[in-house]
């Protein structure tokens, strides 16, 4: 029977040496938002606690400044 090995999650920010997450970097922030507009949890993305907090703050700031939507675009 073949065993399924799950790929180890790692913090992208630690690996790339990023020290601060900028709220103006919308393309980066979009990668950590679900289709519904929710912030994806760190247990799914593998982001460390320190950067998950910075990420959440940056996303909330970008939402407040209308750089990111609060929710998805409702159709119908």
Swiss-Prot record:
Q: Which SUPFAM superfamilies match?
A: Ribosomal protein S18 (SSF46911)
Secreted: is it a keyword of this entry? no
Recorded hits in InterPro entries, A to Z, give: Ribosomal_bS18, Ribosomal_bS18_CS, Ribosomal_bS18_sf
Q: Which GO terms describe its molecular function?
A: small ribosomal subunit rRNA binding; structural constituent of ribosome
Coiled-coil positions? none
What Pfam families would the database entry show? Ribosomal_S18
Q: Name one GO cellular component term.
A: cytosolic small ribosomal subunit
Q: Which domain of life is it from?
A: Bacteria
Keyword RNA-binding on this protein?
yes
**Keywords in UniProt for this one?**
Ribonucleoprotein, Ribosomal protein, RNA-binding, rRNA-binding
Q: Which GO terms describe its biological process?
A: translation
NCBIfam families named in the record: S18 (TIGR00165)
Tell me the function of this protein.
Answer: Binds as a heterodimer with protein bS6 to the central domain of the 16S rRNA, where it helps stabilize the platform of the 30S subunit.
Assembly and interaction partners: Part of the 30S ribosomal subunit. Forms a tight heterodimer with protein bS6.
Protein family membership: Belongs to the bacterial ribosomal protein bS18 family.
Please give the name of this protein: Small ribosomal subunit protein bS18
Q: Which organism is it from?
A: Psychrobacter arcticus (strain DSM 17307 / VKM B-2377 / 273-4)
Which classification does the entry list for the species?
Answer: Bacteria, Pseudomonadati, Pseudomonadota, Gammaproteobacteria, Moraxellales
């Amino acid at each position: 029977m073949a065993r399924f090995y799950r790929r180890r999650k790692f913090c992208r920010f630690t690996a790339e040496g990023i020290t601060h997450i900028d709220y103006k970097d919308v393309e980066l922030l979009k990668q950590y938002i679900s289709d519904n507009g929710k912030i994806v949890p760190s247990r799914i993305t593998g982001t460390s606690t320190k950067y998950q907090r910075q990420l959440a703050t940056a996303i909330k700031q970008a939402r407040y400044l209308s750089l990111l939507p609060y929710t998805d675009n409702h159709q119908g």
